[in-house]
């Protein structure tokens, strides 16, 4: 293929066109594929590429459009659905809102009705049934419900109640009482209406629900009453005129009556006009079912003596859960009643339980089916139906009974309404006439009824049926006139319809309520089924019998019960034959209404009867005028039929129920009946036979019945069966058995209803109250919750406050002990010496120490910082407050110190440098607080004292011997004075091992604090290198400040301050706490010391050997190593000082530390730098030195004891023999152990000799201070040791002796002062503290100040191998001498010394500042550090020191080291040996030697001489300083 197509044509090649592939593409499957792909047309034409692409584009476009449409449709559907849902939601919300509004309105109406409690009372009316009695009731009945529920005018078509204008006039006594009944019934119905959630139904709704009143005692207030179609409004009483124009209204009622029988109860066309006002139909059937408990077939003797059985009836109302509709205990043959809650459309399903066991089930289409009464379960059934009231047939029953056939509509109106009226009147007259004949019969029947026994004779029923048939036939024969009347009525206009409605209805009502035959006692006032309504509609004859006032419903119901559907058919036939449908239609609604009314207001039966009678008379008079014989048969037949039905109903009811009280009631009723008959006869005789119609007789009879009913009521009042609000089983039975008129039972029932209503109202009231209470309770719990929350919040706040307070407690209490724990903890966590983590370890160690002193609690730290800030920057008042709080916390938390120490130590190990800063701040705060609390001196004095101390350092700095002695003395003080400090030293050494650089940093800090120059020099060099300018400025300022401060400080002030301190110390809880801590610490230290001493004894020889070797190594080693050794020593010492409150006073350390931290923002850097220095210079040696130091310290603890013992001897050797005595002491104590220490001690002794004047004093003072501290520590630890120390001190100097004799608290004060308490209130003490604290501050600044210092120190160490050691010694000596001098000044309170010191300090500072010599540089370094500690600017110190000349420092230090002491010992080796001695024994061994040296030093040369010697030393050092360019560091 390729050969037939050149390569150039390959691009245009189309395989479809290739003839070689034609066969392939002609394949059906392939063609189908090509066609589907759009490459060819259906005809087989090959599409060009352009067409193909176009088609594909179109196809894609179509696809896209389809997708878009689909998506649009989808979204549209979603939107529509969403909108639909929103609409549904809105509708639901609207409905809910309407219901809520209706409920509120109903509640309002209910409240208004509740005000009319007399109307609703369950007892019969108390007042007379006269105009006076009912006038108010009428007003209430009409005004309150109408005003609240019927805003429409009275004449509105929907308002079926008579307007107020139609109220009967009081002049008509026969009619007066009727409105009362009406009003009462209306008020009741309005109440029921409101309860039934029809608050705005108006009067029509009231009328609709009136029939449910008789049953309301068993109805739930939340359930809608049954709305039955046959319930009509009650007409008003007849107008006083007595005229009735009925033609107007017959047509409308006829129209209203004829409606589909299948229409549901609540949707009847009769109420279409007002349907908008009644939104809901009844949810339940609400049929009142009366049943009888027939009893068990088998009775066991073991049954409970209570013969009653527990009956429960459950109904499945809507196909779901069963409801208990009845529960009670019944005797056999006892009836009970309950309300069916069947939902429309669901079957009527009942389950019967007897004593907890299910005995029967019933499931039928509706309640109406059982209206005739039947026994459930056959012959052996336990239950039977007595009657079913207010039941409406379901569709099935309607169809089965043929009730679905609509009645024939009336003919069109006739043209002449007058003829209609005449015909109607004639027909009514005939009815009346015929009634005259029927009434006697009826009376007889009623009498028979009353005497009816429990057995019902079938013959009577047959007779009644026959009579009914006869009456129907007669009515049929005379139906045409009735039809004409009906037609006339239909043609009649509506102008008088409204009023006449009520008038005629009133008339009917009277007759009905009396004649109705009380037949359905339980049916009374209870709506009857639509079937009955239909029957009424279908029986025009009966309905035309309106005048007879029979309750057609009751009558029909009776017929239904007796005859069933046959009667309904009969009625239909009658309807076809009769034409009086209009009359019947009118009569039926009104009769039903009147019946309802009579049922409701039965308590006023007499009134009703009288009203009915009067109405009848008036109507009879009217009718008699127009009476025509041809129309009489129809009413007569109807009345007969109705009477017969009533009789039958009553008999049937009576038959089904046992009547235990028949006789008494029968007698009463018989008597009443006889009386009534007599009265009727009289009435007939009085009136003409024409006018006296059967109605009158019936009225009289009803009257009589009512009277008898009243009597029966009186008798019945005590009957047990009458249970108000309960199920009236017995009363119904009694009434039925007696055949008593319905009025009788209705009175009771209405009373029960009233009671029920009252109870309902009460329940509602209580419910409302409960609601309110519940709401209030809901609110109350909210308030309570809020209160609780507030309380909790307050508690939490208080707790926080407490925590804040407690935090300070923790922060300040365990200062003394915590350092030990922290150190021990650090000791346990030994870390190899070379770890770079050393800086962090140092930070941690320092943090531990500070945490131990200041607490690790961040709150405590914050408080400490606040306290620091207060002490430095804020008013002393706040400081005092803070201090007081902190001190109090400190004192209070002594018991927690141990635990807190451990915790703080653990936390301290993990603390960051930030925590260290915070700790430093805490310490400073603590120290400042202590200082303030002790002396009341502001913390600012600390800076001054530190400045002074730095000046003193400068003054004394030039003197190496003094420095060496100072080291010795300080170390001796440390070692001898604080065996707990030994532990701390050891711990710190361990810490040093853990973090060699930490140890070094601490060493630097603590060496400086104790006068050890090495770390100070390194740190100073570092600072000098990086912060020359600032150092110079700050140093100058600091020096000037210090000079000024010193000038200001007077000896007397010093004395006063010291005295004040001494006086305050015992008072201050802090000090007590400190002393206690010291005691605890020393106790612990003693325990540890014993172990350590043993270890030291074992390791002593090794330590000596190591010390010698180390001394040699260090002598050979670069000054970095020496610095590290010194650092190691210093950290130990510093740790001792800082940890042991006896020596350094936590507060002083804290204070010095805090200013250092604050002054030295580069603390972390310094730590790192120092770490680097130590790593570079002598990490290994440091570790070794630390090990050696540790051993040395262990040995020192034992040597210290020896030194203490020997110290007594040496003390007596004389103060001037200090150089000799000191070496002697030192050699005596550790000589056998460490020869190098002996050399170091000799060097120290020589140094002391060279500085005998000044350093003798300085160290005498410092030594005394240290001795005192030692004594204090030892005294606390070991009384013997304390004694020895005191003896030594006494030997050394009487003043020292006196000072030593001061209480331990004073010693602790001095210790704290010597530590460099920023709080130094005694300014001499302040100097001493600055001496100690200054050095320590330098060390701390070396730690904190920094990164710069560390870097610079690293470089310096490399460069300053030899000179650095000497320089550090010099610095340390200066610091120590300075601190010694400060301490001596503080101790002895020598005004001269203070003044001289101030002057000498000024001179030295000035000389140092002017000369810029090497030694002055070193001195200034010390001063600078001290100044930094006091002023808080390490940078300035560094710069000034560097400006002064690091080279000279190095050289001068080298020379100083070479010079060693005034004796000419300038050998670095000797100095290094001395250093080694210090490093190994210094803390333990040197302490006794230094004590001895101090004992010799107490000689008090003038401070001026000391200063001069210092100056000479400085000059000599500067002259002898060999500044090699290698040592120079830019």
Swiss-Prot record:
Where is the sequence biased in composition, kind Polar residues? 1517-1530
Q: Which GO terms describe its cellular component?
A: cytoplasm; non-motile cilium
Presence of keyword Cytoplasm? yes
Ranges where the record places region Disordered: 165-187, 408-429, 475-661, 673-724, 773-870, 923-1146, 1167-1334, 1360-1383, 1425-1530
**Basic and acidic residues: bias regions:** 415-429, 531-545, 552-562, 600-616, 684-717, 773-787, 979-992, 1039-1116, 1173-1212, 1464-1487, 1502-1511
Q: Which UniProt keywords apply?
A: Cell projection, Cytoplasm
**Which residue stretches does the UniProt record annotate as biased composition, category Acidic residues?**
563-574, 638-647, 943-958, 1289-1300
- Its name, as the record gives it, is Glutamate-rich protein 3
């Amino acid at each position: 293929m390729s050969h037939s197509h050149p390569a150039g044509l390959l691009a245009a090649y189309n395989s479809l066109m290739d003839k070689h592939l034609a066969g392939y593409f002609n394949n059906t499957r392939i063609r189908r594929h090509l066609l589907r792909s759009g490459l060819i047309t259906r005809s087989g034409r090959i599409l060009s590429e352009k067409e193909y692409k176009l088609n594909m584009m179109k196809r894609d476009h179509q696809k896209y459009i389809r997708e878009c449409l689909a998506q649009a449709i989808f979204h549209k559907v979603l939107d529509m659905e969403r909108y639909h849902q929103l609409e549904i939601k809105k509708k639901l919300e609207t409905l809910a809102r309407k219901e809520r509004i209706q409920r509120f309105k109903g509640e309002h109406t209910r409240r208004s009705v509740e005000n009319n409690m007399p109307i609703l009372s369950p007892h019969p009316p108390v007042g007379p049934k006269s105009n006076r009695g009912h006038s108010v009731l009428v007003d209430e009945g009409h005004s309150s419900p109408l005003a609240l529920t019927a805003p429409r005018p009275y004449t509105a078509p929907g308002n079926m109640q008579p307007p107020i204008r139609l109220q009967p006039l009081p002049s008509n006594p026969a009619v007066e009482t009727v409105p009362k009944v009406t009003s009462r019934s209306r008020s009741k119905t309005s109440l029921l209406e409101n309860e039934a959630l029809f608050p705005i139904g108006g009067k029509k709704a009231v009328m609709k629900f009136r029939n449910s009143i008789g049953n309301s005692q068993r109805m739930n207030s939340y359930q809608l009453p049954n709305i039955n179609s046959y319930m009509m409004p009650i007409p008003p009483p007849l107008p006083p005129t007595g005229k009735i124009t009925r033609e107007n209204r017959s047509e409308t009622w006829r129209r209203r009556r004829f409606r589909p029988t299948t229409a549901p109860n609540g949707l009847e066309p009769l109420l279409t006009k007002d349907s908008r006002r009644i939104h809901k139909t009844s949810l339940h059937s609400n049929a009142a079912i009366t049943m009888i408990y027939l009893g068990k077939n088998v009775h066991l003797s073991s049954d409970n003596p209570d013969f009653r059985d527990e009956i429960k009836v459950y109904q499945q109302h809507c196909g779901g859960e069963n409801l208990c509709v009845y529960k009670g205990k019944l005797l056999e043959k006892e009836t009970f009643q309950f309300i069916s809650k069947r939902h429309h459309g669901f079957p009527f399903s009942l389950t019967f339980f007897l004593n907890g066991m299910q005995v029967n089930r019933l499931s039928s289409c509706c309640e109406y089916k059982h209206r005739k009464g039947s026994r459930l379960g056959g012959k052996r059934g336990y239950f039977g139906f007595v009657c079913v009231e207010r039941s409406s047939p379901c569709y099935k029953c309607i169809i089965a009974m043929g009730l679905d056939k609509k009645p024939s509509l009336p003919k069109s109106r006739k043209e002449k309404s007058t003829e209609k009226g005449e015909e109607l009147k004639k027909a009514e007259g005939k009815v009346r006439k015929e009634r005259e004949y029927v009434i006697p019969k009826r009376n007889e029947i009623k009498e028979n009824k009353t005497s009816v026994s429990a057995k019902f004779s079938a013959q009577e029923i047959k007779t009644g049926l026959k009579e009914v048939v006869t009456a129907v036939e007669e009515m049929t024969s005379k139906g045409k006139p009735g039809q004409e009347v009906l037609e006339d009525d239909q043609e009649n206009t509506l102008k008088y319809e409204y009023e006449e409605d009520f008038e005629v209805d009133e008339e009917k009502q009277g007759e009905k309520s009396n004649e109705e035959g009380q037949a359905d006692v339980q049916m009374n006032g209870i709506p009857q089924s639509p079937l009955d309504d239909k029957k009424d509609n279908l029986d025009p004859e009966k309905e035309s019998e309106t005048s007879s006032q029979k309750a057609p419903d009751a009558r029909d119901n009776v017929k239904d019960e007796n005859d069933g559907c046959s009667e309904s058919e009969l009625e239909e036939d009658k309807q076809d034959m009769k034409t009086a449908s209009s009359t019947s239609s009118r009569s039926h609604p009104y009769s039903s209404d009147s019946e309802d009314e009579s049922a409701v207001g039965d308590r006023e039966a007499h009134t009703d009867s009288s009203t009915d009678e009067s109405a009848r008379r008036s109507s009879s008079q009217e009718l008699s005028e127009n009476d025509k014989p041809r129309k009489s048969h129809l009413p007569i037949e109807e009345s007969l039929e109705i009477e017969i039905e009533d009789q039958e109903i009553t008999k049937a009811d009576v038959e089904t129920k046992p009547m235990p009280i028949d006789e008494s009631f029968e007698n009463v009723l018989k008597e009443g009946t006889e009386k009534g008959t007599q009265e009727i006869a009289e009435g007939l005789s009085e009136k003409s036979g024409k006018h006296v119609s059967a109605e009158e007789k019936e009225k009289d009879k009803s009257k009589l019945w009512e009277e008898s009913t009243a009597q029966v009521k009186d008798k019945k009042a005590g009957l047990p069966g009458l249970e108000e609000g309960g199920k009236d089983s017995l009363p119904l039975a009694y009434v039925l058995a007696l055949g008593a008129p319905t009025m009788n039972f209705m009175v009771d029932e209405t009373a029960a209803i009233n009671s029920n209503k009252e109870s309902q109202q009460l329940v509602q009231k209580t419910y409302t109250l409960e609601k309110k209470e519940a709401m209030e309770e809901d609110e109350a719990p909210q308030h309570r919750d809020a209160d609780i929350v507030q309380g909790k919040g307050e508690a939490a706040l208080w707790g926080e406050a407490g925590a804040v307070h407690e935090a300070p407690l923790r922060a300040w209490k365990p200062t003394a002990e915590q350092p030990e724990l922290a150190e021990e903890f650090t000791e346990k966590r030994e870390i190899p010496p070379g770890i770079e983590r050393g800086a962090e370890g140092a930070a941690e160690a320092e943090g531990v120490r500070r945490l131990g002193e200041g607490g690790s609690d961040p709150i405590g730290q914050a408080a400490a910082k606040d306290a620091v800030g207060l002490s430095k920057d804020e008013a002393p008042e706040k400081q005092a407050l803070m201090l007081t709080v902190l001190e109090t916390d400190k004192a209070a938390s002594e018991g927690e110190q141990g635990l807190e120490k451990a915790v703080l130590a653990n936390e301290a190990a993990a603390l960051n440098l930030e925590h260290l800063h915070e700790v430093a701040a805490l310490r400073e705060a603590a120290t400042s607080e202590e200082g303030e609390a002790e002396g009341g001196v502001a913390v600012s004095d600390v800076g001054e004292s530190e400045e002074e101390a730095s000046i003193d350092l400068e003054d004394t700095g030039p003197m190496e011997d003094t420095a060496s002695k100072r080291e010795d003395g300080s170390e001796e003080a440390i070692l001898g004075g604080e065996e707990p400090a030994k532990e701390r030293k050891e711990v710190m050494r361990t810490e040093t091992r853990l973090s060699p650089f930490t140890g070094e940093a601490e060493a630097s800090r603590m060496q400086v604090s104790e006068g050890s120059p090495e770390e100070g020099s390194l740190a100073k060099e570092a600072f000098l290198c990086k912060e020359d300018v600032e150092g110079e400025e700050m140093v100058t300022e600091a020096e000037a400040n210090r000079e000024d401060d010193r000038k200001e400080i007077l000896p007397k002030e010093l004395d006063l301050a010291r005295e004040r301190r001494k006086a305050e110390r015992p008072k201050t809880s802090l000090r007590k706490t400190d002393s206690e801590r010291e005691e605890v610490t020393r106790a612990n230290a003693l325990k540890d010391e014993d172990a350590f001493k043993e270890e030291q004894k074992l390791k002593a020889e090794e330590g000596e050997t190591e010390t010698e070797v180390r001394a040699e190594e260090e002598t050979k080693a670069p000054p970095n190593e020496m610095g590290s050794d010194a650092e190691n020593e210093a950290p130990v010492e510093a740790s001792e000082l800082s940890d042991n409150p006896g020596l350094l006073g936590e507060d002083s350390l804290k204070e010095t530390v805090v200013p250092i931290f604050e002054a030295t923002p580069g603390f972390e850097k310094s730590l790192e730098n120092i770490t680097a220095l130590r790593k570079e210079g002598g990490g290994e040696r440091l570790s070794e030195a630390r090990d050696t130091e540790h051993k040395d310290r262990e040995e020192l603890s034992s040597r210290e004891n020896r030194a203490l013992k020997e110290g007594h001897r040496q003390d007596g050797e004389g103060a001037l023999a200090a150089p000799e005595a000191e070496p002697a002491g030192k050699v005596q104590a550790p000589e056998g152990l460490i020869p190098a220490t002996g050399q170091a001690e000799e060097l120290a002794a020589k140094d002391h000799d060279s500085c005998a004047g000044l350093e003798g004093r300085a160290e005498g003072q410092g030594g005394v201070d240290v001795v005192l501290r030692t004594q204090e520590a030892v005294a606390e630890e070991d009384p013997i040791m304390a004694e020895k120390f005191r003896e030594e001190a006494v030997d050394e100097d009487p003043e020292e002796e006196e000072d030593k004799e001061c209480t331990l608290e004073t010693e602790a004060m001095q210790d704290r002062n010597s530590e460099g308490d920023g709080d130094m209130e005694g300014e001499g003490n302040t100097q001493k503290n600055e001496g100690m604290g200054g050095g320590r501050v330098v060390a701390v600044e070396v730690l904190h100040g920094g990164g710069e210092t560390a870097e610079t120190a690293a470089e310096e160490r490399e460069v300053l191998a030899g000179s650095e050691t000497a320089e550090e010694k010099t610095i340390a000596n200066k610091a120590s001498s300075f601190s010694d001098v400060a301490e001596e000044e503080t101790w002895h309170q020598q005004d001269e010394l203070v003044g001289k010191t101030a002057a000498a300090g000024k001179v030295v500072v000035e000389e140092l500042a002017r000369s810029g010599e090497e030694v002055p540089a070193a001195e200034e370094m010390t001063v600078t550090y001290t100044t930094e500690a006091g002023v808080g600017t390490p940078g300035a110190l560094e710069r000034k020191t560097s400006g002064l000349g690091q080279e000279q420092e190095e050289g001068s230090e080298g020379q100083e080291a070479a010079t060693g002491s005034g004796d000419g010992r300038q050998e670095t080796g000797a100095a290094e040996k001395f250093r080694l001695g210090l490093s190994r024994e210094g803390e333990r061994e040197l302490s006794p030697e230094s004590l001895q040296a101090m004992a010799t030093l107490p000689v008090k040369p003038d401070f001026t001489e000391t200063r001069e010697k210092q100056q000479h030393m400085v000059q000599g050092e500067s002259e002898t300083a060999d500044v090699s360019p290698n040592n120079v560091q830019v």
